[in-house]
């Protein structure tokens, strides 16, 4: 696995729930690729998850990925909560169904295809990769709104 990909992901939602978008900036050997999309009725957390899922799904072969997100929800889910959710059959400690379990399961499947290193960055402080992902997520929102 010598292919190393830098990936920056972000989600956006206008209203929560409301129209939302996700964005991904990938950099591989100096070449950039942008991905974005959106949904008419969603939440910010779902769009944060979707950005990571779509970015990882777009990779054609097993890669080393450094995935940077500004989402504490994604970071805590992947690094702290998911292992116990899986042990409990996708239930929380309170025995409630995990919110967004459909997307967490997709993310788990994609993470297992690659060697992913997760990084968190504070949002909206001028980090270039994160700012680009944010712009792409907002493009996703704008395109969904334009379809109405």
Curated annotation (Swiss-Prot):
Q: Which GO terms describe its cellular component?
A: cytoplasm
Q: Where in the cell is it found?
A: Cytoplasm
Q: Where does Mg(2+) 1 bind?
A: 10, 48, 70
Give the EC class as a word. Answer: hydrolase
The annotation note on the cofactor reads: Binds 1 Mg(2+) ion per subunit. May bind a second metal ion at a regulatory site, or after substrate binding.
Specify the RNase H type-1 domain's residue ranges: 1-142
Q: Which GO terms describe its biological process?
A: DNA replication, removal of RNA primer
Q: Which cofactor does it need?
A: Mg(2+)
List of residues binding Mg(2+) 2: 10, 134
Q: InterPro entries annotated for this entry?
A: RNase_H, RNaseH-like_sf, RNaseH_domain, RNaseH_sf, RNaseHI
Q: Which GO terms describe its molecular function?
A: magnesium ion binding; nucleic acid binding; RNA-DNA hybrid ribonuclease activity
Catalysis performed (reactions): Endonucleolytic cleavage to 5'-phosphomonoester
Q: Which NCBIfam families match?
A: PRK00203.1
Q: What does this protein do?
A: Endonuclease that specifically degrades the RNA of RNA-DNA hybrids.
What HAMAP family is this protein classified in? RNase_H
Q: How is the subunit organization of this protein annotated in UniProt?
A: Monomer.
Name of the protein this chain belongs to: Ribonuclease HI
Organism annotation: Pseudomonas putida (strain ATCC 47054 / DSM 6125 / CFBP 8728 / NCIMB 11950 / KT2440)
The organism's lineage is: Bacteria, Pseudomonadati, Pseudomonadota, Gammaproteobacteria, Pseudomonadales
């Amino acid at each position: 696995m010598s292919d190393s990909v830098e990936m920056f992901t972000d989600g956006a939602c206008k209203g929560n729930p409301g129209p939302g978008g996700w964005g991904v900036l990938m950099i591989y050997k100096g070449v950039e690729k942008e991905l974005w999309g959106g949904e008419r009725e969603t939440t910010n957390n779902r769009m944060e998850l979707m950005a990571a899922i779509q970015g990882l799904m777009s990779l054609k072969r097993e890669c080393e990925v450094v995935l940077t997100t500004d989402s504490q929800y994604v970071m805590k889910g992947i690094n702290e909560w998911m292992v116990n959710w899986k042990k409990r059959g996708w239930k929380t400690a309170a025995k409630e169904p995990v919110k967004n379990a459909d997307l967490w399961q997709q993310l788990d499947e994609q993470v297992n295809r690659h060697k992913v290193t997760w990084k968190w960055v504070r949002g909206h402080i001028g980090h270039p990769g994160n700012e680009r992902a944010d712009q792409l997520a907002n493009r996703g929102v704008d395109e969904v709104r334009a379809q109405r």
